[in-house]
């Protein structure tokens, strides 16, 4: 396609004009010039050609255009007419009415005139050139001669600077491809000029142009064939010879540096074209264009039309190497982009490449508009990582500092926004932002009075604060300025960002020290505030309490919505409080200054942390609790003292009930640290608090938090009223830690008894580690086991284990340690003395016959005691008759816990007495379980029946080999009951999994006892003891009275120094008789052998039938009471001989009820307020009722925890089996959780804790659970009126006194009542026994429910949900067969 252009000088007017020769020019003549263009060419190419054609701007010309398009001439003409008319519609241009566009059909017309380059001299050389009329080939050749003769021409084709684009060269090559024709060579002369436009003679030897065809499949036709002559005089000659038509891309490089940022896409057309001899652009043309652009930019009405001229050309001129032209065009461009729409168009059309080109210029920063453009562009592109990476690598950070110091506010604001975004989204780029120049810029930006700029600057500092240190002077200067600005700023939003920075600074020890020395503490806790109240904007706790009581339908949805709205309103305030608390906690961690710890342990610092505790935001509370944990771990003991004296313990404990999982570790560790400093600081904790710790202990038993919880409970266990609750609730996990603490010397649970207070009479035994002596302590019969540390058989580890277990366990069938001493050189244990000695003494003495009924009674008590141990995860590991002590009433007490340990994954090999060792223990296995004690129990039962020593006829090495290889067992006597035979057989089976649990054994023996009772072998005597009469195995004939009936003779809480009782009841320590048969001996390296004195052998009077008042179950046993100061409720089972109103201390004051505030916070689920535990911040006092559940107490292990707190007088004790049917278990307590049935768990299968846990849940302390707290620390005068008065109701102590009066008024009446109760219970047992067996066939165990379910209904109604789950024992196939056989019998 060719455009026919007819141009007339603007100087000519009218219908015609004279030329320089006076000839009139006829517009209809052939004075026309042809311009060949292609439809794909953009408008800027047409404009550039027009300028090149006529050497002067078209404003001075009349233009007549004819478009020749053989395919679609009309539409093509219309399109070009529109483009050119829009180009010429400028007020400075004269639009002539005679301007026309005509369509001319030229068939195969070949133009005879061709364009030649202008003269390479001055801009006025056009006047010397002939007019463009009647141009022909000859005139073209004449022009070549003229040009060749004009030396020193100034031409510009290509910039000499590497890396710059050259639009002229791109256009030249592209136009050459347009004109190219197959078989015709197209030549381009390439000139190189300097920045002044002067010709460079020495052309680079590494000039490369590649023309590649796009989307070509064939390799041969991808690259266009052309020849390239590298060097010829003052130019380089490129010869192109197109072969295949299509789209090509151009790549132009000089010294391997691309000069064309974007390849020029073009299409070759098949059209004849003669050789183009020369193509170049002159400097005169550039000057004329600048003149035209300047003319257009001078008037506001025409400056927008510069886009009509083409922004591409304008931008090309901006990068022209002539500095004068460059500065001029940059100024015009800056004026052009004052309007935002023009900025958008530039960035939209040219993208981020334009920014990089612009900042590469030398003088762009002199123009404010360009600064604004770059600043706004940086703000827009700050989230685009590719741009950021390229910007920092190619441009650098100094541009930011340059723009930020501009006078126009938009520039520093945009820079602040840019820095804040970059510091937030790209941590990798922070290395560029921590330079000294940026920090100086940040300091400058902080001084600007613009909120957006300051906020973004503070945000940048907070994001970069983790990268700061004191090694650079700029960091110190920035911190100093930040501290000064913090004093001036009052807006919460600014304080949020400042303290966010401070919180990060305080992580670094040097920065933290600098901030402290420069007054940050005065910003956190003002010294002038003497009231301790801080105006911290927090949505505090009482806000939520108020809404709970105001809203009538305070359902969960309303409360959550309320909290959500408050969070939105106080978002900035909440953030401020959080970063303030984070700054304090980080400061406490980083600094080694004890002064800082002391600052926040008292005074305003402590008051501030207390306020954080009651903040609604979880993160704030967490940081406050973290601060308390750090202070409590400070080497400065004064800090811990201040915390305790300030009453922080109640706040921490009460917060546990509402704390989230992230807060709990800080609270627990704080309490543990304070306990290490002062063990008495947690003495005021109540039952609810202890239950909460036990719940946390088992929530995640594998966490490190369990050790801290156990440490706290270990200090509380020294209180007799909590001991049984903690042991039963904590289970084996707690006992493991407790024993570890004792062994390490961190805790001592052994109550110290001075040796001067002991009256030792005679030696009753001697062993390899010490002696056992009988004596008295405050008038009570005791046995003292003295250890000789120099003996080889002594083991301090075993001493601590035995002392700990015997001190903390509370059960009617477990020997209790009253106290003793663990001091080196004076190590002894003081225990109850039992006059009948050990079961081994009874068996070997052959003085008192052991009837079947008595054996059932003894075996049942051993099983119950062992079941209690197993429920706590304890393996005795040395169960034998020598370790089973018998009191005057034939009650069994298990002793000698030196070898006992809590179940672990790995156990000690071969521990215990060999003949009682289980098969797996003899094999040396370390993974044996509690079933090893069941194996030992079988031999205890066998020894009671046979009254012989196991394997007495064999050497030890012989019978061990027979046991391991041939499963040999001692022969069971023929006179043995079938029930005993079957039980022994199952208990000593080689496979531990086939052995029953002690809970199953208890059930079995209970049913056997009932069967004997139905057959007349057993009867209940008036004294409340079950003995055998007549027929098989008579235990003894009761006289109907209970002349020698024994209760505990040592009461911990009632001994006052007077001894009014000379009871014949004695207490006994572990007596391991020495026997020449080694089968009775334990392993030498681990077991103590105690030699019993001949003077202390049992006599016939000891086995007198008249003194036999044996109970049918441990729940009716008379347990000896513990001495004064013991930590065990041994005397809880009955009234002490000296327990009366005169000896018992009375309380003439009332315990005040706790004033507490409920904590319902928006970031936590809203619990049911009625069922929620009272926390430390309840604003309505709710009395805590103490329910007397003694009449419904059915625990076989815990019978009334403490006489001082429970009424024991008329307790009806019933036997209750914890292995119940689903219906019965549902009746026990609502909400009982399922148990973890692991064998090594303290809630393991077969070791149900129903009795213990029901006792734990029923027993309630007489003191209010928790603490009596002061009002919240914020504005005490305001909240003082909200504290309710103390409730003046009678305390549980009064009831206890009354109960004790009843206990001591008439013992005979009590005995009669007990007789009646027992008779009634046994009648019920007889009625229900068969039903119990039939209802539990699926369990394979005969279970006796007795009256326990009915008796416990009231107890369940008065007791909260059971905290510790009841585990169901496993079904045993061998037991099922045994039960079937038992039913048939």
From Swiss-Prot:
<feature type="region of interest" description="Disordered">
    <location>
        <begin position="1091"/>
        <end position="1266"/>
    </location>
</feature>
<dbReference type="InterPro" id="IPR051681">
    <property type="entry name" value="Ser/Thr_Kinases-Pseudokinases"/>
</dbReference>
<feature type="active site" description="Proton acceptor">
    <location>
        <position position="878"/>
    </location>
</feature>
<feature type="compositionally biased region" description="Basic and acidic residues">
    <location>
        <begin position="1145"/>
        <end position="1162"/>
    </location>
</feature>
<dbReference type="InterPro" id="IPR016024">
    <property type="entry name" value="ARM-type_fold"/>
</dbReference>
<dbReference type="InterPro" id="IPR013783">
    <property type="entry name" value="Ig-like_fold"/>
</dbReference>
<dbReference type="GO" id="GO:0007165">
    <property type="term" value="P:signal transduction"/>
</dbReference>
<feature type="compositionally biased region" description="Low complexity">
    <location>
        <begin position="1107"/>
        <end position="1144"/>
    </location>
</feature>
<dbReference type="InterPro" id="IPR001245">
    <property type="entry name" value="Ser-Thr/Tyr_kinase_cat_dom"/>
</dbReference>
<dbReference type="InterPro" id="IPR014756">
    <property type="entry name" value="Ig_E-set"/>
</dbReference>
<keyword id="KW-0547">Nucleotide-binding</keyword>
<dbReference type="Pfam" id="PF07714">
    <property type="entry name" value="PK_Tyr_Ser-Thr"/>
</dbReference>
<protein>
    <recommendedName>
        <fullName>Probable serine/threonine-protein kinase DDB_G0268876</fullName>
        <ecNumber>2.7.11.1</ecNumber>
    </recommendedName>
</protein>
<feature type="binding site">
    <location>
        <position position="785"/>
    </location>
    <ligand>
        <name>ATP</name>
    </ligand>
</feature>
<feature type="compositionally biased region" description="Polar residues">
    <location>
        <begin position="1055"/>
        <end position="1073"/>
    </location>
</feature>
<dbReference type="InterPro" id="IPR011989">
    <property type="entry name" value="ARM-like"/>
</dbReference>
<feature type="region of interest" description="Disordered">
    <location>
        <begin position="1287"/>
        <end position="1339"/>
    </location>
</feature>
<feature type="compositionally biased region" description="Low complexity">
    <location>
        <begin position="1242"/>
        <end position="1266"/>
    </location>
</feature>
<feature type="compositionally biased region" description="Low complexity">
    <location>
        <begin position="1295"/>
        <end position="1339"/>
    </location>
</feature>
<dbReference type="GO" id="GO:0106310">
    <property type="term" value="F:protein serine kinase activity"/>
</dbReference>
<dbReference type="GO" id="GO:0004674">
    <property type="term" value="F:protein serine/threonine kinase activity"/>
</dbReference>
<dbReference type="InterPro" id="IPR008271">
    <property type="entry name" value="Ser/Thr_kinase_AS"/>
</dbReference>
<dbReference type="InterPro" id="IPR017868">
    <property type="entry name" value="Filamin/ABP280_repeat-like"/>
</dbReference>
<dbReference type="InterPro" id="IPR029071">
    <property type="entry name" value="Ubiquitin-like_domsf"/>
</dbReference>
<feature type="compositionally biased region" description="Low complexity">
    <location>
        <begin position="1189"/>
        <end position="1232"/>
    </location>
</feature>
<dbReference type="GO" id="GO:0004672">
    <property type="term" value="F:protein kinase activity"/>
</dbReference>
<dbReference type="GO" id="GO:0005737">
    <property type="term" value="C:cytoplasm"/>
</dbReference>
<keyword id="KW-0808">Transferase</keyword>
<dbReference type="InterPro" id="IPR017441">
    <property type="entry name" value="Protein_kinase_ATP_BS"/>
</dbReference>
<feature type="binding site">
    <location>
        <begin position="764"/>
        <end position="772"/>
    </location>
    <ligand>
        <name>ATP</name>
    </ligand>
</feature>
<dbReference type="GO" id="GO:0005524">
    <property type="term" value="F:ATP binding"/>
</dbReference>
<comment type="similarity">
    <text>Belongs to the protein kinase superfamily. TKL Ser/Thr protein kinase family.</text>
</comment>
<dbReference type="InterPro" id="IPR000719">
    <property type="entry name" value="Prot_kinase_dom"/>
</dbReference>
<keyword id="KW-0723">Serine/threonine-protein kinase</keyword>
<feature type="region of interest" description="Disordered">
    <location>
        <begin position="1040"/>
        <end position="1074"/>
    </location>
</feature>
<feature type="domain" description="Protein kinase">
    <location>
        <begin position="758"/>
        <end position="1008"/>
    </location>
</feature>
<dbReference type="InterPro" id="IPR011009">
    <property type="entry name" value="Kinase-like_dom_sf"/>
</dbReference>
<keyword id="KW-0418">Kinase</keyword>
<keyword id="KW-0067">ATP-binding</keyword>
